[in-house]
């Protein structure tokens, strides 16, 4: 059975291939995948830390920030997205992260990546993922096909 998050991965990767053909990216297909105990143990040995984001876009870009009423742009070394299926609630009404060990671990990794010069975010659903990607990479750069 295909999970909602797996479909989201496929759709986002398809969008990137079609709309940003020169941009390099990698998605972690093993994320959420059912593995045998042996496969899971082997996979764990190759990882430094749990909760690594689902998608990495290897393209520098700019993100907008606001401070003291001023708007500026920061250059980032690449973008990491942790993709969540549509409807997943990450935050409480007061804006704090919901109590969930796995999501808290993911948020910690995203924070560390942001501190290291990357743009790292949660993206809930296809529309939010595409908006974050477009804000970071700019408008799609379709290749012209000449005959």
Model-based region annotation:
Residues 1-147:
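Catalytic phosphate/metal-binding cores of nucleic-acid and nucleotide-processing enzymes, i.e., regions
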């Amino acid at each position: 059975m295909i999970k909602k998050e797996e479909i989201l991965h496929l759709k986002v990767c398809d969008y990137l291939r079609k709309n940003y053909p020169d941009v390099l990216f990698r998605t972690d297909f093993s994320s959420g995948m059912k593995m045998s105990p042996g496969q899971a143990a082997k996979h764990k040995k190759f990882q430094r830390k749990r909760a690594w984001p689902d998608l990495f876009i290897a393209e520098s870009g700019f993100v907008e920030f606001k401070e003291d009423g001023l708007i500026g742009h920061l250059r980032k070394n690449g973008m990491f997205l942790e993709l969540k299926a549509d409807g997943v609630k990450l935050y409480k009404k007061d804006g704090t992260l919901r109590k969930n060990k796995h999501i808290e671990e993911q948020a910690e990794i995203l924070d560390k990546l942001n501190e290291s010069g990357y743009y790292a975010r949660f993206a809930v659903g296809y529309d939010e993922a595409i908006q974050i990607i477009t804000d970071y990479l700019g408008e799609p750069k379709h290749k012209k096909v000449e005959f």
